[in-house]
């Protein structure tokens, strides 16, 4: 098989947490090892314990940047209590809505095929043109909103209104882009297109610019 993801899994009962998993990637894993090389082997790296999950798409030593990959709890961070198991069991078992977990085959193939993409940003430094590349992997809330809205539109057709809330810096542009692409190619059970076109309207210049580059 192909190595598409790595996981550092920690257990609080042995005195380690997700923070130890993050540090292990930073200090104990050689970023030049083939499996950890950016764009070469694994596409995403998860730091996980029984309660929380974080992920990154680029291991870069102390410059490694982690993003939360949690369900959210009581309109805040983290994961809710799971009476049937670990708080992070949504990764390998079932989601709260009963759908298959994030790491199950069909779910992960959907992420790779319909979410994951390489973002290339052109910039200039000291008069020299450069490129910054980033692998964009959806955070949990982005993945869920795209999947749920798409499924509802497939089942109920066009004409419904939705209120989707994102906090500042949580990836609104990517969520909008992913959902727009899915809806534009969405068909019903008779293979008829549900939407003739998808139009994105925004009242913020910054968001408008971000969307054009997404």
Per-segment meaning from a language model:
Residues 1-198, 202, 206-214:
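ATP-dependent helicase/translocase motor core
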């Amino acid at each position: 098989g192909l190595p598409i993801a790595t996981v550092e899994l920690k257990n609080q009962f042995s005195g380690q947490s997700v923070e130890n998993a993050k540090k292990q990637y930073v200090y104990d894993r050689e970023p030049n090892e083939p499996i950890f090389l950016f764009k070469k082997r694994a596409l995403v790296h998860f730091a996980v314990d029984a309660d929380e999950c974080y992920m990154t798409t680029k291991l870069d030593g102390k410059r490694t940047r982690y993003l939360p990959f949690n369900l959210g709890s009581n309109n805040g961070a983290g994961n809710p209590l799971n009476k049937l198991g670990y708080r992070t069991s949504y990764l390998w078992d079932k989601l709260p809505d009963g759908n298959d977990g994030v790491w199950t085959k069909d779910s992960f193939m959907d992420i790779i095929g319909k979410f994951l993409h390489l973002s290339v940003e052109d910039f200039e430094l000291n008069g020299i043109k450069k490129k910054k590349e980033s692998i964009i992997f959806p955070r949990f809330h982005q993945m869920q909103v795209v999947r749920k809205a798409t499924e509802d539109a497939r089942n109920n057709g066009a004409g419904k209104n939705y209120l989707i809330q994102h906090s500042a810096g949580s990836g609104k542009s990517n969520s909008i882009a992913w959902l727009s692409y899915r809806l534009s190619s969405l068909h019903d059970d008779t293979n008829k297109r549900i939407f003739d076109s998808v139009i994105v309207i925004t009242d913020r210049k910054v968001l408008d610019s971000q969307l054009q580059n997404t």
